[in-house]
C-alpha cells in the first residue's frame, strides 16, 4: 500500500489517503493496480494543482532482498508519477526525518504514533499514516528553510 498525507503550509492535516491493491496476487501482478490507484488518488481526490511539493521516504534496508527490491520499485514508480505530474519531489532517509521531527533518528513506531496524535489528533488508523504525516511535516519544515 502507498500511504499519502496532505498537510497545508500551516501543517494542518488536510486528508489521508491509501492506494491499495489485491495483496493476494504476486507483486508483479498487483503492481499495475497499485499504481493505477495511486494515480487515481492524485487525479480524482487530491487537487494536484494545489500541491507545491512532495517527499517520499527512501526504501529502507531490510534483511530480505526481495523486500528491498519491492520497496525500491514502488518508490521509483511513485517518484516517476509525481515527476510526470510536475510535482517537485524529494526523497528522505527515515533516520533523517525522524531526527528532524522527533529528535532521534532511531525513534520507534510508538514514538512516531504518539507524536502524530499529539500534533494532529487521533486520525491515524494505521502506523504508516502517522509515518507519512511526520514525513510530510519534515517536508514542510525543509521547504520553509529552503533546503528541499
Regions found by a protein language model. Name each.
Residues 1-148:
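Phosphate- and other anionic-substrate recognition elements at nucleic-acid/protein interfaces
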Amino acid at each position: 500500500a502507498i500511504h499519502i498525507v496532505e498537510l497545508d503550509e500551516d501543517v494542518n492535516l488536510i486528508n489521508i489517503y491509501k492506494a491499495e491493491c489485491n495483496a493476494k496476487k504476486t507483486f508483479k501482478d498487483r503492481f499495475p493496480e497499485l499504481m493505477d490507484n495511486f494515480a487515481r488518488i492524485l487525479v480524482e481526490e487530491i487537487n494536484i494543482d494545489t500541491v507545491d511539493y512532495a517527499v517520499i521516504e527512501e526504501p529502507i534496508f531490510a534483511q530480505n532482498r526481495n523486500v528491498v527490491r519491492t520497496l525500491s520499485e514502488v518508490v521509483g514508480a511513485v517518484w516517476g508519477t509525481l515527476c510526470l505530474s510536475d510535482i517537485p519531489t524529494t526523497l528522505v532517509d527515515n533516520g533523517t526525518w525522524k531526527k528532524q521531527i522527533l529528535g532521534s533518528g532511531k525513534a520507534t513506531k510508538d514514538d512516531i504514533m504518539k507524536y502524530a496524535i499529539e500534533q494532529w489528533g487521533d486520525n491515524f488508523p494505521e502506523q504508516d499514516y502517522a509515518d507519512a504525516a511526520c514525513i510530510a511535516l519534515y517536508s514542510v519544515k525543509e521547504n520553509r528553510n529552503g533546503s528541499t
